[in-house]
């Protein structure tokens, strides 16, 4: 089983800009990664592979900023799942998060 990622370890490997929500590499983790490169790839959310595990960037942002893993869901205030700026993230219950789902257009 993989060792749980800590804030200390996260900060050794990645830099997080709370204003832009962008993570960049502080160390080379593979031949394809250069120091200063933007970390992660875009899907439904931004994902970052770190220490053999795949993480959602918004959850890493929470750990980076507050030192603990979120105990609830993380909601993006503006509904943009790629905007991981700290001001755009809030910890919510599942039911609170459902209120932020847009109305279907069909």
What are these regions, as identified by a protein language model?
Residues 1-50, 54, 103-104:
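Short helix-coil boundary/hinge micro-motifs
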